[in-house]
Amino acid sequence: MYTAHWRRHISNSLLKYRPARNFSQTTSASSHLNPPLNLDPSLQALLKDVDISLTRHNLSPRAPPKELDVVPYDHSNESSTDFVDEIESELDRKSPAALFGSQRIGAVVLPLELQNSINLLITESDKPQLHLDAKRLFQDGEDDSDGDWFAAYNVKYRSHQQNYRHRERDGTAFASVALPAHYSAIRSVLEHAKHRLGPDWSISRVIDWGAATGSTLWASLHTFYQKSGDEVDIEGFKIADSSLASYVGIDKRDGLVSIGKRLLQNAERNELNIQWQRSYREDDRIPRDEGHDVLAISAFHLSSLPNGLARKQLVKEMWESGAHTMVLIDHSTTNGFENIAAARELLLKLGKKELESGEEWSVSGCHVVAPCPHDGKCPLYHPGSGRSVCGFSQRLQRPSFVRRTKHSGIGHEDIGYSYVVVKRGTRPVITNTNTKLGRVGAVGMRELRKQNEARTVVKELTLHSEDEAPVEDQADAAESEPAPGPLLNRSPDDLENALRQEAYSWPRLVFNPLKKVVTLS
């Protein structure tokens, strides 16, 4: 009986599913393709274009824009191009003195060796976290606008444990944001000092207070090189091409120093000796007569020191190091400028005290090379109440990693800085202050010709006989001969050396000139 009941249950179940089978058969029968339609060829082309556009619309998100590739420049045809001739004619418009006084390096481009080192560092890091760290350290507020980014590093942590957790991340963010900006400003100052002091000024050893991730190290390596200036390709410059023999970096911020060491791991250094230490030691001192090729420098570090006593101690260490050239750089803020002005005042005071002591040194005293044209009191320095800042600006062509870290599409940025370059020895004295060499350029020559033409007396035409011998008028002969002067008797090198000595007394523009208003120092 149980078996019969089970058979009836299965039979009823099969009857319930029969419509579904019939529906399946009907669907299968109607699934045959319809015969193709004979469409007009123009309509077929239109449908094909629409299909292609819809297919492209559903593709994956757009790929990021490609970066520019560095193509080696062929210098063989440089002299024959019209572009170079146009540049030379444009430079000839200025007088030699104006050209010497206005020479600058332009926008700074980070060498590929440094870019590759920083790119490798960023590749090994957490990029979203890197952007957050960069905003936390170098941006004021939550907005991603470029105007809120700064290059000052003044972070303070509550405990050593917190400092230890953040030091590697902070160092990576510093190398991605602050190092390129600091590098450009330091390069600008060193190149200007090199221009002002002449080809005889060479540096083989650098002592750096506030080394951080090595901004000064890289800038010094790319400023002092073995080849002549015409043969150097700065973008492809390598550490091995530098004439620097020794570098001492002094900094207590272990996180920044560790990143600075990592940036040098894959670089070929040859015989360059690099040392990192937490403080200045007595054995770092150099005898005074051996310091002619030694540079003592501190860049963007004075503002990070806790008080004036620490800043004063740093400046004294630079003076006692034995280096003949001392450079201090800080941000072009009120605080940064006051730090530079106070350091300048202290160095001049130490130099004056040394001259008055009567002790015999191989070189005594000191003087300001740049930017001041004097060794007197700074007219803009009023501690605590000053509003004016003696500052300068340097443009940097942003590498790709800077734009990506800041989430910005702008290809350049400007960094403001204040600085002073001090050199041991008394200030050069100009014996003849009335000489003004190199004051006439192409524009001045055209004006002189116009004045001569205006003074020329109009002469009447006379009949000329072929039998008469040609006679040159004395006035015409005098005009055709160049006027004698010191400029014509000097070679370009001699003229540049004379202008270099004369530039010690040239006034400096300390503010952007306004219409009919110029402020000089």
Residues covered by each model-derived region:
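Conserved class I S-adenosyl-L-methionine
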Residues: 201-212
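Class I SAM-dependent methyltransferase Rossmann-like catalytic core
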Residues: 158-198
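N-terminal mitochondrial targeting presequence
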Residues: 1-56
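Conserved beta-strand signature within the Rossmann-like core of class I S-adenosyl-L-methionine
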Residues: 322-332
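S-adenosyl-L-methionine
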Residues: 253-290
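Conserved SAM-binding loop of SAM-dependent methyltransferases across substrates and taxa
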Residues: 213-240
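A short SAM/SAH-binding and catalytic strip from SAM-dependent methyltransferases
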Residues: 292-309
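C-terminal lobe and adjacent flexible extensions of AdoMet/dcAdoMet transferase-like proteins
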Residues: 399-521
